[in-house]
Each structure stands twice: as C-alpha cells, then as structure tokens.
C-alpha cells in the first residue's frame, strides 16, 4: 500500500533510535524514546493560499528531518509504522 499525502502533508519514516545511552547503558524497547528524526518518503502537492495559488513544500522525498516528539499521526502501511504530518510540524532539514 502506498500513501499519497494531500496538500501540505508529508509521510515520514522514523530513523532508528539509539538503543544505548551516552554512558553505554542498553535500553529495552519500551524504555527507549521514539526518535524525533526521520526521512521523508512522500510529499503532498503543496498548500493552496488565499489567492488560490499552490505553494510547493520546502521538503522533498529523501530529506532527513527533525520534528516534534508528538508531531503527526501514526499509520501502518505494509506492516511498517509511518507518520503523516503537516509541513509546519517539521522543525528543520538535516544537512550533511
């Protein structure tokens, strides 16, 4: 199943969380926090402004992003957990 987001929404796959703390303690799955970084896997066509013009999104497929811990709606597609969120919930793009 493929999810095609509408308007200013993006579909994000969370990046794997670290399973060890900085001091080397291994965290069990339930104790590890969900990561607040992910990779954009699909983008909508853009938000329609008051003038009727469509504004394209600043993020694109493949971008690594940072978002709020409670951002977006969790959905499952083909057994994979994904997030659907608005572009405004994205704090920034991680550049190398």
Swiss-Prot record:
One Pfam entry name: Cpn10
UniProt-recorded Gene Ontology molecular function terms: ATP binding; metal ion binding; protein folding chaperone; protein-folding chaperone binding; unfolded protein binding
Cellular component GO terms, alphabetical: cytoplasm
Signal peptide coordinates: none
Keyword Cytoplasm attributed: yes
Entry keywords, A to Z: Chaperone, Cytoplasm
Biological processes, Gene Ontology terms: chaperone cofactor-dependent protein refolding
Location(s) in or outside the cell: Cytoplasm
Subunit structure, interactors included: Heptamer of 7 subunits arranged in a ring. Interacts with the chaperonin GroEL.
Job description of the protein: Together with the chaperonin GroEL, plays an essential role in assisting protein folding. The GroEL-GroES system forms a nano-cage that allows encapsulation of the non-native substrate proteins and provides a physical environment optimized to promote and accelerate protein folding. GroES binds to the apical surface of the GroEL ring, thereby capping the opening of the GroEL channel.
NCBIfam families: PRK00364.1-2, PRK00364.2-2, PRK00364.2-4
HAMAP family, alphabetized: CH10
Family: Belongs to the GroES chaperonin family.
The protein, known as: Co-chaperonin GroES
Gene source species: Neisseria meningitidis serogroup A / serotype 4A (strain DSM 15465 / Z2491)
Name of the coding gene: groES
């Amino acid at each position: 199943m493929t999810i095609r987001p509408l308007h200013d929404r993006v579909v994000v796959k969370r990046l794997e969380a670290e399973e060890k703390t900085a001091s080397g303690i291994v965290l069990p799955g339930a104790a590890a926090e969900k990561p607040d970084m992910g990779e954009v896997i699909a983008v909508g066509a853009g938000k329609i402004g008051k003038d009727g013009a469509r504004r394209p999104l600043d993020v694109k497929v493949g971008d690594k992003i940072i978002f709020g811990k409670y951002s977006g709606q969790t959905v499952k597609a083909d057994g994979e957990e994904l997030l659907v969120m608005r572009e405004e919930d994205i704090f920034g793009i991680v550049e190398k």
